[in-house]
Structure formats: C-alpha cells, structure tokens
Amino acid sequence: MAKLIKCINSAAGEHFSVYNGDCVSVASQFPDETVGFSIYSPPFQNIFTYSDSELDMGNCASDEEFDAHYQFLIKQMYRLTKPGRLTAVHCSDLPSSKWKDGVIGLKDFPGDIVRAHQAEGWIFHSRVCVWRDPVVEMTRTKALGLLYKQLKKDSTRSRMGIADYVLVFRKPGDNAEPVEQMPENFPVSQWQKWASPVWMDINQTNTLNVRMAKDNADEKHLCPLQLDLIERAVTLWSNPGNVVLSPFMGIGSEGVSSLKLKRKFIGIELKPSYFKHAVRYLEAAERQESLFTIEMASDETACEIAE
C-alpha cells in the first residue's frame, strides 16, 4: 500500500496503516488481491447513529438505502481479498418498531448480508452464533418480549434474546498460502471447541475502552467487538504476517488484536474522534504497552473532548 491514499487523515506504524475517510472511497484506492483476511462490524442499517456525516452509512433514510450503499463496499472487499481467503462480518437480527416498520418484531439483517455478499460472488462459508445474555439485553433495552411482566400477561409476545453472529464468506479460487494450524499451537481440543456452531464463551466485556471516544457533538452509539472474538477469527483464518483489513475500524479493536497476533493491519474509519484514539491504541500495541496504560491516558483525553 505504498501509493498515496486520498483521505482526510492517515497514520502508520511499522505494521499498520490507517486512514480517516469514507471506507468505499479509501478502499477503492487499494490494489487488487492484497488482503489476507478482513473482519468488521458494519453499521446496523439505520438502527444506530454513529455521526452526523453524510458519508456515514448509518445515516440512511431506509433499509434499502443502506443496502445500496453497503453493496459498494462488499464489491471493493471482494476485489481486495486474495483468492481462497475470507471475510468475517459481525451482525445480529435487528428489532423492528411499530412507528418505523409497522410491526414489532425482528428483521433478518444477517440474511440481507448473506444475499448481498452472494450477489458479488462471495461463497457463504460459515455462520457462528455468539451467545449473549438476555438479562443484560432486557436491562439495557427494556424490550417488551423479554420482560417478565409480559410473560405473565401474554407469553405469545415473549421472545428469546438477540444473539450475535459472525458470517464468514470465501472468495472463490485456490488459496496460494494455506493457513496451517500446528498441533502444538492448536490442539484438537481447541478445534473441537472452536468448531462449535455456538460460541458460548466470548466475554462480552472484553473490549477496548470506549469512554475516551465519546464526542458530545454527535456520538450516539459505540459498541466495539470483543477482543477474544477478533483474536479467535484472526488466528483461525489468517497467517502471521498477513494483512488484516477492517473498513469500519472504530477505535481500533481489530487492529490491536491483529498486531498482537503478529499480523499487519489496515483500517479505515470515517469519524475523526474514533480515528484519533484508534491510532493511540495501535501505537501502544506496537510498543506492546499495557492496554490498561493507554486506557488511562485516553480517559484523560475524554475529559478534554467533553469540555
């Protein structure tokens, strides 16, 4: 990625390059078939607002508008990925609301993602269900279907909690560089655990500190991926030295995990405050500083942003 990339801002270390800008615009400038693996969490249609930027995919008038915008990125990800290699997309079912959708229920966002990738030539490779605590969801969202009083009143309106999913897609073609797992580093007992269609042991609180990325001007939602989930995917589907890409870098979770596992990282993030703190995390990861140390420093910065 030696060419000059047109973007708002950029930063680089020995093993990472990150860009502040629109993910489709920036990704379109990268060379073909240079990415060994990608993992990211896209905006969940227009459920959450991440910023006020008109370039933000989350700022869309409808699900159809989001799908059209997201399709451009999927096309770029296909072009960038090496043949036989994978992309992993974190997502979940989305709640529908009476005021917006006409009914209270769920929308099949994972299904939309699968169909969108298949339309661009990706092969649907795997789906992992990531368990989430329904009590935490009920406490946070007060969703009618999870309330005990609704169960007592009329349990036909009661539902299960919403799980997370990791959808994995493979680019057709032969993989020129097999990802070989050695028994001394990846015993069969570990594979039996990871091969489960449901990952029950992902620690939902094992995330980078998010307080420092708050921007009072437009911050509405921030939910970084769990580090153990990222590390599991990167270990399973890439080799040390491979390039790992995240087009929705956020505060740098995928990058920190990739550097920890001796991969190279390329990230794109639209929001300047997220980008700024992602750079801090990535620089600290290259120096192998304690994440606790950089979080403490970032908390001080959060106070500066809020003032």
Identify what each model region corresponds to.
Residues A2-H277, E307:
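Core catalytic lobe of class I
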